[in-house]
């Protein structure tokens, strides 16, 4: 930050927020980051292509049109509360459109075609889903992607084929905010672990059953679960040290920052292999690339590759020569001033909102202005993070079953989450099966707090094809069952001896009914055949 304290306020703003005075040593990290961000957006939209109609379609579990119709009671405020393109239409065609437009934009972003415009399309399409998805969009990974995607609008180079964008290096503020997001994901996760008071983090037993009890485990996690207890104790302590201490290396000189990148990257690899956290870990890894610089990456990349990356830079660089006419010069200057003002306000706003939310974790609600924080909440671009504040005790799984006589029940097989004890848990991240994920969260609470489970029962009772597409198969074929229920099981990894003797990956025990058993009454209305107990047993 040479001589920055001696500058005028206007020059400091330009130094922070304009690309002309930007971080010219981060062209390669920016190039790789934006290509990777395109891949992550692609994975998010690809997952939605196969699920969106079953989740929020007109015949889905939580129809977007019903939700938005209810929000019309808010008046014009509804457009702020739910910023989504689905206000124009929430038909199946529109849902498919936002997925495929997002997919195409993500591919073009990967190909470095008009990156700013493609980032805007990806952000608008993904925000449109998240804002209307209700229970199916409460994940921290969604907020992480939207925050990174929005800041990248200011981080990316202009132009249709900008190459490395050497004439438009990333502004220091946009680079810092992306690094700041990376830092907060780790540090806030560490803080919430201590602030929650969960004894498992304090006595270093948090990792003892982590691989079994997480949302969607993998077969590698099964093996890691059976490692000696001392290794799990070490992993617990190392997690806290990494999240609370090591990430501060971001703010140290260059060599420390690069060392931090390698430590954190190596730590993420076993996390990816032992659990399916959709695109979350890949996005965190990608944000970490911004800890590197051109000098480091140039040592590892061949000259032909560097030339290929930047082969269109000169041809696509914007013309910076000043127009000859005075009025054009003034117009050009005014436009640049407005762009700089908007960038300065927007990025400062995001930083303030995220800083305030981070301070709330250890200090509670400080007497600071909260209106700026609240104003950005619906857009998910200034978030508070905190992964695994409290470790789950036990693994519970909800299963949908149908019957024609009330005696013989057949289960609807899931595509991804644990169900069949003989089936090995798979590895499929960054794909995100949102129904499977939500059922894991629902299993930890009561059905009345997770009404999407009852909605899913209704759609299965109607044999709806959109909702059935979320499952591996339909045990009832073309004829709808007469009764549908949701039951709950407790699951455990089998021991090494049990696995060797039986070939099973899981043991499970039935805990009974989770949600009401539904049927169609003679008059065609929905009826309840059996109610679950008031409180679910949690052994």
What are these regions (language model features)?
Residues 2-539:
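Alpha-helical membrane-anchoring segments
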